[in-house]
Amino acid sequence: MSENEIVPDEFRCNRSDGKQWRCKRRALEGKKMCESHHSQQSLKRSKQKVAESSKLVRSRRGGGDEVASSEIEPNESRIRSKRLGKSKRKRVMGEAEAMDEAVKKMKLKRGDLQLDLIRMVLKREVEKRKRLPNSNNKKKSNGGFSEFVGEELTRVLPNGIMAISPPSPTTSNVSSPCDVKVGEEPISMIKRRFRSKNIEPLPIGKMQVVPFKGDLVNGRKEKKMRCHWCGTRGFGDLISCLSCEREFFCIDCIEKRNKGSKEEVEKKCPVCRGSCRCKVCSVTNSGVTECKDSQSVRSDIDRVLHLHYAVCMLLPVLKEINAEHKVEVENDAEKKEGNPAEPQIHSSELTSDDRQPCSNGRDFAVVDLQRMCTRSSSVLRLNSDQDQSQESLSRKVGSVKCSNGIKSPKVCKRKEVKGCSNNLFLSLFPLELTSKLEISAEEVVSCYELPEILDKYSGCPFCIGMETQSSSSDSHLKEASKTREDGTGNFLYYPTVLDFHQNNLEHFQTHWSKGHPVIVRSVIKSGSSLNWDPVALFCHYLMNRNNKTGNTTDCMDWFEVEIGVKQFFLGSLRGKAETNTCQERLKLEGWLSSSLFKEQFPNHYAEILNILPISHYMDPKRGLLNIAANLPDTVQPPDFGPCLNISYRSGEEYAQPDSVKKLGFETCDMVDILLYVTETPVSTNQICRIRKLMKNIGRVRSKNPAKGRESRFDKGKKRDRLDDYSSSDSESSQHCLGAKCRGSEFEGEERESCNYSCEEESLSNTYGAQWDVFQKQDVSKLLEYIKNHSLELESMDSSKKKVSHPLLEQSYYLDEYHKARLKEEFDVEPWSFDQCVGEAVILPAGCPYQIRKNKSCVNAVLKFLSPEHVSESIKRVKELNQLPQSVKSKANKIEVKKMAIHKISEAVKEIRELTSSDSTGALRLYN
């Protein structure tokens, strides 16, 4: 083959440099390369060195084929070696001027971007060297890289600005420390830089966090374990929290503060639960004792909707109050010689001290207008009562303070008032105010679309199809009756507390507006460290009573204690007894008012407020739908709780009779939370401890008899609450009232001879109370049944006192026999259900109910006033006012009408403020 032969492209060797050059020799048959290149490729595959003689030399750009290296003249090889040597020397040179000259000699196009960038970098370095005279010294010390450190190079390009970040002098080929995770091996990332392919990355170890200086100083000191409360040291008596692994508590403080068992504290301490009340934790968690502020989370739109709902429910009550005002004024005008002119009406300026109930017991809940006699300094309270047959206008008279500040002992008689020429109407709420308030409330209601009001006797649309699933654990219905004609009335709403977390009250309000009770599950939070054991609570209270004798109330005015010992002799009556055993018995009934509950058990009191199932209705301070919340000074605040009810019975004879709450109803709404249920008998140590604490109280009272009498006199009214619960007392039991135990025969030697031992048993069933709840419309039938069977019911009641109103006085309890007779004669059947631990029973106002406790229970009771049942509450208060004074003194005085008027006024005012601040939000709300 001649060297000048032109080979077609399809037969040419495929060897090329990838750009322009390609071998012009002919490829071998069946191969893609020529003979020379094929042999070179074979040597490279076998990892052998290619001989210099077999390499081809490219021809210059003028043309010509490649020739072998053996054909090159010696002079030409020398020239080539000189050229290569010069290029190597130029690379070694570190001077920027020499590199700039070499670049200038390169024959490249002027539009080459890479060459332009290199030239720009070199120019910047030359200019920087001229500005910095000491650059040569820095270059020697830093190994030639100092001029690139700390400076950022930028280049303005047609489409933007390009920046070249400077390299790090120490870690030139390692990624940034921010890209390395703590405690893991870093990944070496080589930064792309000119002529830096062969530079090996510098080794780097695991990155670690250096401790803070304060931690290093504290770490040098030996960690000392101290009790979180008392600061006591010691390893043996301290219990460490496994949750935080930081707090320690001694055994004495745990027992003294009643913070649960050792296992509960070890699992999760009070600091972790947020129930610690020490100074440090109180400063950190200042808002723990307050009610949970659910309104802060609720949006303004939801708040306005709730206020609108309250106004819509209370507007009929306001209209009724204004109608009664109008009737009072018109009737009084007719009495004055037929003069139809409107009498002069003045607003009341009476303080809370002056607004006391009259001697005849007229409660201020129904007092709207008063007639004041200027001569006798008395007040004639007027109220329309259409139920009385004597007169269409009922007038009750009571004394108030005279101008000299002394109470008038005489009561202004009707004939004396009739002779008075200076009679003036005294209105606690001016008619102008209530009439304007009614107009404003109607305007608010017209802008709000209420949901469709269903018939009280119709079924709930949310519960359709759930009746068949009532037996399942996730059902929202609970079967409480089986023989009602209306199948939907056999079931009660049975939600969990989680169902109310998203302000989902529509389903609840559907059942609540019908007057049905609601049972809420899972109210008590899991993992609570508070101890609700009744014996422990009573002992804790007695200890506080001993420590603070002069400041606290008399404990026996709130507790009824019965202690007894029964001995058993087994064996021959004549001979020596083979076995001599005894059994301790304890009966404990107590009712703690809200003030005493908060004073003696602040942690338990705060826990009750935190676990309220529906805070919008039940929060006593911030409940948006609670009419009794956030009252002004002009309205007497009622004592709605929460209160604590303790019922404990131990021993064989005390386990047989049932402690019951007799049939009756409340004048307001109520929620009852079952906190604790036990069947564990009391131990001898607990009985001895109670006796010892009660003896200490009696010893202190004997020294200060005046304080004891004064305390019993002040709190004597509270003893009547214990009459609601009845139980059969055995002859061997000893009744202790007022810290003086009449059972003096229980000496220490006799107690030590008792070998009673008890073991705690796990309760398979956690229910402790059985409820029977009747409907509001069944009140008249219940009264008629009690009237017909009063002799049978009185035989069951040991008190045998005169009864004016069986339901208001809570005088009788209907057992299974009487409930069956009631169903047979009047077709009235209650909702009967069992209350388990952690369940809250929400009861509407006016619903008759009775409770039978099968076990020892501790429950909290809180009363509230919902807008749906204000009318029913007013009706029940009127019935209560017609009873004798002895009965009314037991009831909690509530001023329902005043609270309703104040709630409407505040709701209308707040709605206007919220809607006027954001006009767009108001438009979205109303449209």
From Swiss-Prot:
Enzyme Commission number: 1.14.11.-
Expression (tissue specificity): Expressed in inflorescences, flowers, roots, siliques, leaves and stems, especially in the vasculature (mainly phloem), with highest levels in floral organs. Present at high levels in flowers, shoot apex and young seeds, but observed at low levels in dry seeds, root apex and anthers.
InterPro entries (UniProt xref): JHDM2-like (IPR045109), JmjC_dom (IPR003347), WRC_dom (IPR014977), Znf_RING (IPR001841)
Induction: Follows a circadian cycle with lower levels in the early morning and highest accumulation in the middle of the day.
Motif Nuclear localization signal 1 location, chain numbering: 30-37
Disruption phenotype: No visible phenotype. Decreased hypocotyl length. Delayed flowering associated with reduced FLOWERING LOCUS T (FT) and CONSTANS (CO) levels due to increased H3K9me1/2 level at CO locus.
Residues at which Zn(2+) 2 binds: C241, C244, C269, C272
UniProt GO molecular function: histone H3K9 demethylase activity; oxidoreductase activity; sequence-specific DNA binding; zinc ion binding
Annotated GO CC locations: nucleus; Set1C/COMPASS complex
Similarity field: Belongs to the JARID1 histone demethylase family.
Cited function: May function as histone H3 lysine demethylase and be involved in regulation of gene expression. Regulates flowering time by promoting CONSTANS (CO) and CONSTANS-LIKE genes (e.g. COL2 and COL5) expression via interaction with FBH transcription factors (FBH1, FBH2, FBH3 and FBH4) at their loci to remove H3K9me2 repressive histone marks. Also modulates the expression of several developmental genes such as MYB30, TFS1, AGL6 and RVE2.
Full protein name: Lysine-specific demethylase JMJ28
Species: Arabidopsis thaliana
